[in-house]
């Protein structure tokens, strides 16, 4: 935590270098100004950065108002994030509690009633505005991450149930504003072009070399994946506002149950079964040294069995995955791997992060692609037993 006036109060002063102390003090002042100028939350008293995020920067903050302490999450959206995307995310989060889904955080409105603040910034490159949002703080523990996802069987069962509940709750909502992203079936052809360009312009890092070595295999796998499901089939599958990033790191746990679902910044309109494919990719793929990239079929089966127990609510047409969805699901697990690989590759060549760290993500995705190729028939047979 960074308390008011001095980060040194949170730890021995000798542990803070002068430069770090200045940075933390400046950060506190910056966020304190935002909270007081744009929100009616009282006085900011502590700040702690959430180190797990990759795209946006989030902080766990505490405020004091009328003698009462309250906790929130403050998010600084990455520069270049389209405001209509933010509006879509916030409209979805507003819709969920109105439909009875109480596991998601609430968006805290600004003094002028907006769901986010636009904070003017001045940089050497020019002036622009940073979008800031504040969310209610969810109870529970952060136990896992997307690259350390192997929760217990009981937690895995509950995760599938919560995803099914989320889908059943939001089905029928048609979105808000003018925001529209390509569906995964439209993204795959774009990935082929982008990956070719990255290979052509790559450097000599461990990431570049591994990507170049496996690029032909990846591109061929992508092109083959475009054959099914066809657009005609895909268009008939149930569409809804998918979470788009449903993994154990975006869940809070209290005792043995899920107490919160957060990070809706990847939400978009797409098929329900793509969201399920993404969840299976995240929850059921090993990151262990001797089995990295293996899809753990016992976990896949447990996840699907738990998801399929959902029943359609009165007036809803959703429910368990249908036969056409199950027939498409293995293809969408592969597409989910490609989707995350596309993020990994794009993030590396855009922001130039640690090459070894991102090479690990890349290797994981390549290994899963190969596992899927070698075990395709058995995976398809398993999934189709859930009809």
What are these regions (language model features)?
Residues 51-64, 68-73, 107, 226-274:
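Active-site acidic catalytic loop and adjacent metal/ATP-binding pocket
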Residues 1-114, 257, 384-387:
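Conserved NTP-binding catalytic cores of kinases and kinase-like/nucleotidyltransferase enzymes
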Residues 113, 134-148, 197-204, 338-355:
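A glycine-centered beta->alpha junction motif in the catalytic cores
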Residues 19, 339-387:
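ATP/Mg2+ or Mg2+-diphosphate-binding catalytic cores
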Residues 68-177:
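ATP-binding pocket architecture of kinase catalytic cores
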Residues 146-212, 239:
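A cross-family kinase active-site recognition segment
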Residues 273-316, 334-352:
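Active-site activation/catalytic loop segments of kinase-like enzymes and analogous catalytic loops
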Residues 27-38, 195-244:
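An alpha-helical support segment within catalytic cores of ATP-dependent transferases
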